[in-house]
């Protein structure tokens, strides 16, 4: 196992470059299929984790807490937003510890998907979000613009430790 240097205070870009040069990419079989209720006519979206990003998540000590990204999104939502001025949130906060693959997918959801999609994902009339394996997706992209999450989908809630 490779030991991660103490990256607190190191620019996130430098951490990611170190990881890309040092860590073996990790190709996850999981992906996230999601629908945005604010775009009801849009097809389902599919989010796949980048193999280098997954390697960082599983290694630990590289990625900032997801809350840092939430703070930056709050800034972006302000009407007078022009550019980020709080990059220190990504660079100076203590990097998070190693994650399991499942926990990394949850982190990815909270980082990259709109919060209104994942916050109450299981409270709607139909599922808005599904974590599945790539093999569960259609093997062809024909009719891709018509993909939707099935309303008959049975959701099993599973706690990730």
What do these predicted regions represent?
Residues 1-161:
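Interaction-interface detector
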């Amino acid at each position: 196992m490779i030991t991660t240097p103490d990256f607190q205070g190191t620019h996130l870009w430098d951490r990611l470059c170190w990881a890309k040069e040092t860590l073996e990419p990790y190709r996850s079989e999981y992906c996230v299929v999601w629908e945005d209720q604010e775009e009801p006519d849009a097809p389902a979206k599919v989010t796949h984790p980048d193999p280098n990003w997954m390697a960082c998540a599983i290694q630990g000590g590289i990625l900032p807490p997801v809350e840092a990204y939430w703070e930056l999104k709050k800034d972006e939502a302000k009407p007078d937003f022009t550019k980020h001025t709080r990059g220190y949130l990504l660079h100076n906060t203590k990097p998070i510890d190693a994650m399991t693959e499942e926990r990394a997918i949850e982190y990815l959801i909270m980082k990259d998907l709109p919060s209104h999609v994942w916050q109450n994902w299981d409270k709607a009339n139909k599922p808005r979000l599904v974590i599945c394996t790539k093999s569960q997706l259609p093997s062809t992209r024909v009719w891709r613009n018509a993909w939707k999450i099935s309303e008959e989908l049975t959701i099993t809630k599973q706690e990730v430790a």
